[in-house]
């Protein structure tokens, strides 16, 4: 439904632009993140968990920590920052002629890479072991990240990569 609605919006915008000579542009925005991201999105879930557990991790109170549970660690996403995407939207509207644009970084990173970056930033490197639903992230001999099949999407898209050339 989400993709179908996006496709409908794309074509109705294009149709109005051509039929009524409207200044109407499509901005096709790939994943963009900020502190305002919804709590159920994976990036927010990861950063929130890290923030909530940082002091316990530093104090090595692992028994008080419930592991971070995630779905597909091999999902590749083209993640950018919302502030950059808002600037891109403004620039799209400054063009002399209306057109359609892709707003993306042009590179992908896995969920696993995102988790690793967060833990590295906290000064707590992870070691990974296992594969698939048996994969875990371990810090100081303690499991702090677990893959949980309940977080796998029923129709997961393996790779989302945008071409920002226009």
State what each model feature region is.
Residues 28-33:
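Proline-glycine-enriched beta-turn/loop adjacent to the NAD(P) cofactor-binding site
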Residues 25-27, 103:
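Short glycine/serine/threonine-enriched helix-capping/active-site loop
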Residues 37-166:
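C-terminal substrate-binding subdomain of Rossmann-fold SDR/epimerase-dehydratase oxidoreductases
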Residues 1-25, 47-56:
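Active-site Tyr-X1-5-Lys
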């Amino acid at each position: 439904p989400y993709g179908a609605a996006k496709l409908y919006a794309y074509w109705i915008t294009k149709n109005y632009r051509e039929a009524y000579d409207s200044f109407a542009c499509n901005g096709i925005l790939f994943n963009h993140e900020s502190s305002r991201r919804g709590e159920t999105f994976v990036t927010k879930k990861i950063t929130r968990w890290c923030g909530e557990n940082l002091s316990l991790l530093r104090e090595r109170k692992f028994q008080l920590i419930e592991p971070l549970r995630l779905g597909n660690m091999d999902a590749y996403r083209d993640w950018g920052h919302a502030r950059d995407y808002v600037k891109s939207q403004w620039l799209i509207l400054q063009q002399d002629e209306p057109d359609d644009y892709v707003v993306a970084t042009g590179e992908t990173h896995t969920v696993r890479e995102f988790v690793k970056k967060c833990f590295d930033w906290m000064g707590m490197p992870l070691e990974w072991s296992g594969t698939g639903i048996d994969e875990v992230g371990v810090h100081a001999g303690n499991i702090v990240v677990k893959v949980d099949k309940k977080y796998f999407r029923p129709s997961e898209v393996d790779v989302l990569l945008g071409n920002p050339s226009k």
